[in-house]
């Protein structure tokens, strides 16, 4: 069995009240959540069935996890960005358990329509929001992500 090194910062309290910028990637960077359609002056994401499930589950996060609020999010063809606000959580709830349950819930629903689908890359990326300026920067990044798709570091021509 392969022992993966955790990307989580050792000794950091991921159950503490903070805001996190989270990125969840699709397995092998597959474009399975939707596609970007170019309009005259902007781009638009057209969600696939799986992308709609992912969006539905994002909107349910706060009802499944007390103290969790998704401030902003964007579903892209091969990844998702979220700004997640955590109030002080119970010891069994951390950012990792919340994201893990989200990924499991989306996968479970998606596999009903697409049996055997390997939807997600292992783990996820996170950034602790440090101040108001950092929050504004990441919030704008999320809002502009669809329009900047061709310049995005996760962009892979489908």
Tell what function each PLM region has:
Residues 1-158:
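Short catalytic/metal-binding and nucleic-acid-binding patches
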